[in-house]
């Protein structure tokens, strides 16, 4: 008994063990027999207070109070929902349905001895639960107005009999259960309609949807939003329309190509050509007024008095930017006049060029140009050469220095009369001495010029002598080379005696021979001629004149 008392499955119906909290609660619910709660199915409730306990579309048989298992409870709920949905189509033929062995089993002990009594199966005559596809077909046929006898014709005859039995067993006066999905849909529908009504008070042009059913989670209509079609009207069209939202696709171009820029410039050029001269001048005058607003962002500071006058602001900006040309305020006041349009265009060109070369946080950066570069730019602009421009610059610098010296001398000169007389005397003496010095300088200069001419003449004579000497040296070298060649030929000659071969080799001359060497060579040649006179006659060589 102890083991049976501990195990909940081995408990007998007559056992006096305490019930669990769950069992007590479910027995209490089964005794109340609330129709909305379909969790418990009491059987054969014959109490005087409740003569007939039942859930809609399900009759309770005479049996002991017990609990259903979850699977059996789910099957019973599906059958009850099926009966409630089909009760409106087929009128009931019988008022009540007999029990037909519809007793539910208690969740009693699971021992083999009690299992044969408790586990009762559902008979085959019980109607099976319908599928979702069949329920959808029933709904469509109901909306289209088709007779209820069309659907059973598509099933087996056995199913038709079961349906006819199930239709007859449900009275039409019983309340039909509502599905949880429909309840949630109705609640969501009410909240959506309330929200839409509150948001569409100020929007008179927006039309509310025909029905509150929508598959979108958007509660407030947005741009490009379209309400979906009512699902009740989907069967009217051959093809169902998808419940989707249509939104516009915006094509943003992040990169601008050269072709696009060229087209835009052509459009701007065409528009400018269409305008008259007066319109262009008005446009330029407006641009001059608006350009002043950009100057503070590029390092220009305006005074307090010039904040309301763009002309004064423009003049101050040009002064700070070191504009070199002439500026007239009347040009800025009437920039569209024919006299001022050219000057205004030059001003705009200068200001826009300065605005382009900015650095950092909106500060304008002026190019650093040296004095030499400035002179070169001016020379290139005027077309004159750099030398002329440099001379002019030097001349101007000399003038400035001379003025400074004169001012300094005037500041140093005393103002007393005695000093003035002394200055006159010194000026006279200084002038006479200066004249003498000038005469002496002229004489010396003349003498120096004469000496220079003499030196120049002497240098010319020296250069001529050098040329002649070079020519003589060259001729002497040629003569010495020819003499040496002839002596070598005589040494190689067979006619001469062998004892004179040594003398012949000594007759050669150097490049710079002296007079003594020349006289010796002449004497040696005379001896050689005398010794070989007979041989020379055989060769028909005439002796030199004056020789024997």
Swiss-Prot record:
Any Gene Ontology CC annotation: kinetochore
Disruption phenotype annotation: No visible phenotype. Flies are viable and fertile. RNAi-mediated knockdown does not affect mitotic progression.
Principal cellular location given in the protein's record: cytoplasm
Disordered as annotated region, ranges: 1-51, 82-181
GO molecular function: kinetochore binding; microtubule binding
Motif, SXIP motif 1: chain positions: 149-152
UniProt keyword terms in alphabetical order: Centromere, Chromosome, Coiled coil, Cytoplasm, Cytoskeleton, Kinetochore
Region (CH (calponin-homology)-like region, which is not required for kinetochore and microtubule localization): 237-372
Coiled-coil region: 386-457
Region (Important for kinetochore and microtubule localization): 100-253
Cellular location(s): Cytoplasm; Cytoplasm, Perinuclear region; Chromosome, Centromere, Kinetochore; Cytoplasm, Cytoskeleton, Spindle
Keyword Coiled coil carried by entry: yes
Bias (Polar residues): 144-155, 166-175
Short sequence motif SXIP motif 2: positions: 168-171
Superkingdom field: Eukaryota
Basic and acidic residues composition-biased segments: 20-29, 104-116, 127-141, 156-165
Keyword hit for Cytoplasm: yes
Subunit structure: Interacts with Eb1 via the two SxIP motifs; the interaction is not required for kebab kinetochore localization.
Name of the protein this chain belongs to: Kinetochore and Eb1-associated basic protein
Lineage per the UniProt record: Eukaryota, Metazoa, Ecdysozoa, Arthropoda, Hexapoda
Gene giving rise to this polypeptide: Kebab
